[in-house]
Amino acid sequence: MLMITSFANPRVAQAFVDYMATQGVILTIQQHNQSDIWLADESQAERVRGELARFIENPGDPRYLAASWQSGQTNSGLRYRRFPFLATLRERAGPVTWIVMLACVLVYIAMSLIGDQTVMVWLAWPFDPVLKFEVWRYFTHIFMHFSLMHILFNLLWWWYLGGAVEKRLGSGKLIVITVISALLSGYVQQKFSGPWFGGLSGVVYALMGYVWLRGERDPQSGIYLQRGLIIFALLWIVAGWFDWFGMSMANGAHIAGLIVGLAMAFVDTLNARKRT
């Protein structure tokens, strides 16, 4: 079977499946984080992708609604839960995603109670040569955040991107991306500003780069990031570089993280590109 695409809205997915059924092509929907559409007969893949492109251009075309009526239903057959927001929070994140979020929250609480400096002495990038063998410091800087907006912004993106990677590609892949990007983005940032920095944003930018390029080069992976969001990420880097908003940003970590994510996605999709 071949995965054709994913839709966030299950009714939209059902409309496309119903239409293709009227064209003699049988597709199935599998529910994960989104509604994934699968094709059993891979010889029809080009035809389905062509119809998909037309569907995306104008999903409200009357022929698609007519197809749903012709198939005998106009709903997706899904049962909606009373608390879809809470269900979405749980379903979009795996154990690694939640563990990192919990660690960030606990460290933030500790920083609020006993002070930033006290926590940074234990978790910051090695600020003295005698600390270089305290290996955890090369990674624990990602758990420190210095304002409520800082932690909320980073955790939202971490949940959205990290959760998707973990659900689709496994906890191991998310751990590898996190460890490598934390190490390299931290190294670059300490060259820019010294060891007193913190935040998950370097890892978040790595995930942005990874998810976007992986989706572009290997759509069958089931992960993707809208191009508008990657453009937003680039504009945010530019804004931070030129200090447009007067905010202290870890520009080195952002740039390094993005490059790490793009590089990892490129390597991971080499075989996928060869298959096509």
UniProtKB/Swiss-Prot annotation:
Give yes or no: UniProt keyword Transmembrane helix: yes
Q: Which reaction does it catalyse?
A: Cleaves type-1 transmembrane domains using a catalytic dyad composed of serine and histidine that are contributed by different transmembrane domains
Q: Give the subcellular location.
A: Cell inner membrane
The record's annotation in InterPro entries points to:
GlpG_N_sf, Peptidase_S54_GlpG_N, Peptidase_S54_rhomboid_dom, Rhomboid-like_sf, Rhomboid_protease_GlpG
Which class of enzymes does this protein belong to? hydrolase
Q: What GO CC terms are in its UniProt record? A: plasma membrane
Write down the Pfam families for this protein, in alphabetical order.
Answer: Rhomboid, Rhomboid_N
Catalytic residues of the enzyme = 201 (nucleophile), 254
EC id: 3.4.21.105
Stated membrane topology is: Multi-pass membrane protein
UniProt keyword Protease present: yes
Q: Name one GO biological process term.
A: proteolysis
Transmembrane segments annotated in the record for this chain: 94-114, 142-162, 169-189, 192-212, 229-249, 250-270
Which key words are in the record? Answer: Cell inner membrane, Cell membrane, Hydrolase, Membrane, Protease, Serine protease, Transmembrane, Transmembrane helix
The record's principal subcellular location, in a coarse class, is membrane
- GO molecular function terms attached to this record: serine-type endopeptidase activity
Q: What task does this protein carry out?
A: Rhomboid-type serine protease that catalyzes intramembrane proteolysis.
- Family per similarity comment: Belongs to the peptidase S54 family.
Q: What is this protein called?
A: Rhomboid protease GlpG
